[in-house]
A protein has these predicted regions:
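Structured mid-to-C-terminal alpha-helical surface segments
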Residues: 1-130
Length: 130
């Protein structure tokens, strides 16, 4: 794990006892989701939804993490056409898998827009390479 991808948090374990807990940062989680979305043999729309959620909460990749993602794209020879093709796969049929994972009102809201908001979040995330 990249050192910049680790955050340390104080967690109270009982009265007067504090433990230091290390966890992946939200930025690092976004990097992992960005890689998973493109590298999985079978695309999972839950990755697209997670990317959307992280982006909606203001998470962006810093320069170091963007460069790491670029290294991954180059190593796996993923070009703009492949990225665009993966994004296009985020359609109503594939997004039906989200019905079992999301509250019905969230799913229905996404479905009304034909899941376009997920594709927009992906286009924004990968804009540097599209």
């Amino acid at each position: 794990m990249l050192e910049s991808g680790v955050e340390e948090h104080d967690v109270e374990i009982d009265e007067g006892s504090i433990a230091k807990v290390k966890a992946a940062s939200r930025e690092f989680l976004l990097l992992q989701k960005a890689e998973c979305f493109l590298l999985r043999k079978v695309m999972k729309t839950r990755d697209a939804f997670d990317i959307y959620g992280l982006r909606q909460s203001g998470v962006v990749l810093n320069e170091q993490l963007e460069n790491h993602l670029e290294d991954t794209l180059m190593a796996d020879q993923i070009d703009a056409a492949e990225i665009a093709a993966k994004i296009a796969q985020v359609d109503e049929k594939r997004c039906s898998e989200l019905r079992a994972l999301l509250p019905s009102e969230v799913f229905e809201s996404l479905a009304k827009g034909q899941f376009g908001i997920l594709r927009e979040a992906l286009c924004d995330l990968y804009r540097r390479w599209l």
